[in-house]
């Protein structure tokens, strides 16, 4: 995506290098939407995003808005279907999205480096020095896309926060935003994988303070 943006702006001679600590690309992408990869959402409204800085999430969304996102993926051959506001590839396979992104990166001569865990980033004058366990890269711009603490099996963790903090960014302590609920009973295992539409309300002193409608999925331990 970064290379596509650079090419569209007509920046001559710009080169993009991707540093990935895993032995392959897109592990977290493959898990998105339970393996079906929800690319984006049609319900893009400032009120849908919760932040102490109300303008920040919307500013990020506007930098790559829905029409441009759809145009980008359509240009790669990925057409979408709408499921309750979430947009998924027609194949409903996250691997299809990962594969076209990988092929497009190769086509645009992006340098893809695997097994390169970034250990430090520092800026000296106009250049960033990005250190890994084996080499130090230099770049005029750096996009830090290390992921958060969720799903450590994909290789993500606290590295991204530590690197951002080392560059002077203030870190807000991350909190779980999407968690499973463990239930009591052996019958859950029989329903594992079953999905259905449901509504959930949060009450405080018999007063409803939050309401959400969406998809619920049973697992072998709960929902």
Regions found by a protein language model. Name each.
Residues 56-60, 87-92, 146-154:
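Flexible, glycine/proline-enriched loop segments at strand-loop-helix junctions
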Residues 33-84:
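Glycine-rich active-site loop/strand segments that organize a redox cofactor
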Residues 3, 7-10, 74, 106, ...:
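Anion (oxyanion) recognition and catalysis
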Residues 50, 62, 66-69, 90, ...:
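Generic structural signal for well-ordered, non-membrane alpha-helical segments
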Residues 24, 31, 95-96, 100-223:
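Predominantly flavin-linked oxidoreductase catalytic cores and closely associated redox partners
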Residues 3-34:
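Glycine-rich FAD pyrophosphate-binding loop
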Residues 82-92, 177-182:
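Short linear loop/turn motifs
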């Amino acid at each position: 995506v970064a290379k596509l943006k650079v090419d569209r702006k007509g920046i001559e001679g710009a080169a993009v290098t991707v540093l990935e600590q895993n032995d392959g690309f897109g592990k977290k992408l493959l898990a998105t939407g339970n393996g079906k990869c929800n690319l984006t959402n049609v319900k893009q409204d400032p009120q849908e995003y919760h932040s102490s800085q109300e303008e920040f999430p919307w500013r990020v969304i506007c930098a790559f808005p829905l029409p441009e996102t759809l145009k980008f993926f359509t240009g790669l051959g990925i057409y979408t279907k709408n499921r309750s506001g979430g947009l998924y590839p027609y194949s409903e396979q996250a691997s299809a999205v990962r594969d076209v992104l990988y092929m497009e990166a190769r086509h645009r001569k992006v340098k893809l480096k695997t097994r390169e865990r970034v250990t430090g980033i520092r800026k000296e004058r106009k250049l960033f020095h990005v250190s890994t366990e084996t080499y130090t890269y230099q770049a005029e711009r750096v996009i830090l896309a290390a992921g958060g603490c969720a799903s450590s099996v994909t290789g993500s963790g606290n590295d991204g926060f530590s690197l951002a903090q080392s560059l002077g960014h203030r870190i807000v302590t991350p909190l779980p935003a999407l968690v499973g609920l463990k239930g009591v009973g052996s019958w859950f295992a029989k329903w594992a994988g079953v999905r259905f539409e449901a509504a959930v309300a949060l009450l405080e002193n018999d007063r409803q303070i939050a309401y959400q409608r969406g998809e619920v999925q049973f697992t072998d331990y709960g929902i």
